[in-house]
Amino acid sequence: MRARFKFLIAILVVSISINVVIGYYYSDKYTLTQLSDKFTNFQTTDFEPVQIPEIYEEQVLMLSFEKNVFSKQDFTPWKTKLIEKFQNVFEIPDYDDITLMPVEEISEDEYDEYSLNKYSTSAQDGDNIIFYELKPKDNAKTTSCEDTICYSTVLVIPGSGNQGALDAINQPSQFSSYYYHKGIAEELVRSGYVVFVIENRGWGERGLDVQMNCKQPDVYCSGNQLHRHLFNLGYNQYSLQIIDTMQLLKHIHNLDYVNNEKIAIAGLSLGGPVSIAVSNLSPNVSGTIAASGVISQYKTVGSGITPGMLKYFDQPDLAASLSPKPLYLSWGLNEKSEFGYEAKNKYSAELVNNSYKLLDAEEKLVIVIHNEQFNHGHTFEMTSLTDFLDNTIG
């Protein structure tokens, strides 16, 4: 009996010691109020925009659609000033000034319905661009271009994350369990489109070991750390991605089997604003898709990729300037933070719709608010997206 009593005392001492250590750890990090909230409050709250003090808002959105466009006659002069200011703020060159570099084939794979080629080329600043081409084996989306068969083509710009292009082309990787692009490139090539997928700078196969003690698996950490470090060095990763994508699009324009009258650009998340920008700055883009990509940085105090931008314009202004060209925008009701805010409040959707309505082009605009559960709705809604492509470049 005495031995059993001693054993129970020992267990009690160990238990108390462990709880003291845990208590010390949390008391060193949190106040009692924070601890109470941390362990008792499991309710999530809806996203609410941050209220900025008025002293910082005396001169904002000076080139916005709402402040400058009141009639059809206002639209073209406004767009010209807007795009000029956009290029100035983000240091984006003209399409004609983009230099094409030699393209090297890295690998080639054959599947039952399509071929998959991997390429690399030097970027404008010497970085290494990686991209994939998926080409169908049937002629479902082809037309006759002079003396050859040419294809309707889609350029896909993935969202952030080290899932990267492999997510979009549905190839396995160490991040497969984090994929959220629904293998869009594979889905589209099976429908007959030639599909190109660019690897975003700083992510996936273009990621860098930035030695920032990122936890494994490193899905987002290293890319975000690199973005911030480049920003402090005077580089904007968003700008660099736009320039990379313009270069790839120019390469696509020079392929004899691509129908330059039937090219669409599709972006998810980060890829959304990139697709909007590239479509505004480049010729021969017949349709633009931005899924969970266009948000009001002004209303939601967004991602921080836009230094100085809100003095002049916001993301939905850039989307509105695409009118009357075919445009597809989507958001998910189950998305978190600013994306869910846009889905529920429709701020950007209504602003862009007003632009298309002004130019009598509402039939060219598709706005989808979906109820996807996958990845909390931060993904492509494939049915409406493929319908849009079939109706514009299919």
Where are these regions (language model features)?
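Glycine-rich His-Gly loop
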Residues: 123-125, 156-162, 332
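Primarily recognizes the serine-hydrolase "nucleophile elbow" in alpha/beta-hydrolase
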Residues: 240-243, 247-311, 318
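N-terminal Sec-pathway targeting helices
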Residues: 1-15, 19-22
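N-terminal pre-domain segments of enzymes
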Residues: 28-88, 92
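N-terminal cap/lid segment of alpha/beta-hydrolase-fold proteins
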Residues: 94-147
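Cap/lid segment of the alpha/beta-hydrolase catalytic domain
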Residues: 149-151, 155-243, 249, 253, ...
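C-terminal catalytic histidine-bearing segment of alpha/beta-hydrolase fold enzymes
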Residues: 356-394
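The feature captures the conserved acid-bearing segment of alpha/beta-hydrolase catalytic domains
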Residues: 298-360
